[in-house]
Amino acid sequence: MNKNLITTAFAALLLIACTGMAGAHFTMVFPSDSEDTVWDVSPEDYIASLGETKTVYVMWGHPYEHISFDMSSAPEISVVKPDGTVEKLTPEKITVPGQHEDGTPGDFVAYRASFTVDQDGDSIVLVKYDDADENLIDYCKAVIHCGLEVWEGWDSEVAKEQTEVIPYTRPYGMEEGFVFSGNAKYKGQPLPDATVEVEKYHTLELGKEIVEAAEEKFSYDPPMVFTRQVKTNQNGDFSYTLDEPGIWFVCAAKESDTGGRTIRGVFIVPVLDSFPAKGSASSAELQKAIDEAKSAAQEAKAAAEHAASSATASPAFGAIFVAIGLFAALVITMRRK
């Protein structure tokens, strides 16, 4: 066989293998009103009103690159309510639009289930998904918060016999740049020296744009920015800074010691935009603001001097005119802003 042909074939196989490892698979749990809007998930979707019906969609794929795969089995879905009661939900098989690994569009097998938020506090949606192709079993948790200052239940242990991420940081009200800390456990015990993967979800168009930019800038290893990694300490503790707003996935894995299944605990963290919004004034804008402030001060001084010279009958009239002058200067400044 021609040597060049062998070399080309080997390179092609290597490329295919590398493509298959481009990103981490995650069980994604997104609250939504319909299949048409499921990919437009936001942190606010994880907030509920008392009596509201929440529908959660369960998908399988690479969140960062917005790559989807068919779910090979029906997930087990339950809701652990603030008082500890557990409601098992019936998953309904559906299809959702998405993107294949090669970038072509397609429809993918997914599931959905609904429940009524009937208690104030934090309800935890727990999804068990077994994917034989990837040799993975996920226990994925998403917190649905309800009620003014009823911050109870978000750190509950609900998968005690499996791998689970227990948050130390409350997973709502978090803004970009906050540090998320947690504890990884396996069968109720700390999971030391475990790999924790952290990955942010992107919509389809944004995912394409960011992946293309990453492949150009970090051609030597693009996936290193898709899936970040940290390690737990001897107590199973870990932390990571979630530096952008959006939906984040935090995943701790218990690797099998006997060639069996890898069991993972996945925790979903919705992250808000910075509040209040960060100022982004340039040096030129700051200098302009300083100049305007100086000008306004000079105008206020002139107005005060004019008011004082006009007050002939009584000092009280002078004080009134000074106040009017200062008020006028304030109005001028506010209008300029």
Q: Which residues are covered by each model-predicted region?
A:
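Secretory targeting signatures
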Residues: M1-A24, K301-K337
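N-terminal soluble domains immediately following signal/targeting peptides that reside
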Residues: G23-I290
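C-terminal low-complexity, Ser/Thr- and acidic/Pro-rich disordered "stalk" regions positioned immediately N-terminal
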Residues: F275-T312
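A generic signature of intrinsically disordered, low-complexity regions enriched in glycine/proline
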Residues: I6-T8, D237, S295
